[in-house]
Curated annotation (Swiss-Prot):
SUPFAM superfamilies: Ribonuclease H-like (SSF53098). HAMAP family: RNase_H. Endonuclease that specifically degrades the RNA of RNA-DNA hybrids. Belongs to the RNase H family. PROSITE patterns: RNASE_H_1. Monomer. Coiled coil: none annotated. This is Ribonuclease H. It comes from Pseudomonas entomophila (strain L48). Residues 1-142 form the RNase H type-1 domain.
Length: 148
């Protein structure tokens, strides 16, 4: 697979819970695509997950993907926690239902369609892809707020 796509994702929430947005910057062979959306009542973690899901869902065929996020929650979930959640039927070690299991399952489904390399970047330090995803996530929040 020579189709390597860069995806930068971010989520934003004004109040937690509160109105939230997600943003995605996709870069493929120098061409950029922006995606964003939002929800009236959500959390920052749900928006971080939505950004990753929507970015991967936008790919029409199997791709090599480098997905960059500033979310430790997404990184730890995908790289550390999910394997055991799945073994336990989407329960935590304490036998509690996994929070946001609906979105973790959707992310798992999308990840399985592609070859994804996950990268973490510290947020708000000027990383161009992350900053752009942050702007898009905030656009999602603004659009949800404008609909009230």
């Amino acid at each position: 697979m020579s189709d390597s796509v860069e995806i930068y994702t971010d989520g934003a929430c004004k109040g937690n819970p509160g109105p939230g947005g997600w943003g995605v910057l996709m870069v493929f062979k120098g061409v950029e695509k922006e995606l964003w959306g939002g929800e009236r009542e959500t959390t920052n973690n749900r928006m971080e997950l939505m950004a990753a899901i929507e970015g991967l869902k936008a790919l029409k065929r199997e791709c090599e993907v480098v997905l960059t996020t500033d979310s430790q929650y997404v990184m730890k979930g995908i790289n550390e926690w999910m394997v055991n959640w799945k073994k336990r039927g989407w329960k935590t070690a304490a036998k509690e239902p996994v929070k946001n299991a609906d979105l973790w399952m959707a992310l798992d489904e999308q990840v399985n369609r592609h070859k994804v390399t996950w990268k973490w970047v510290r947020g708000h330090i000027g990383h161009p892809g992350n900053e752009r995803a942050d702007q898009l996530a905030n656009r999602g929040v603004d659009e949800v707020r404008a609909q009230r």
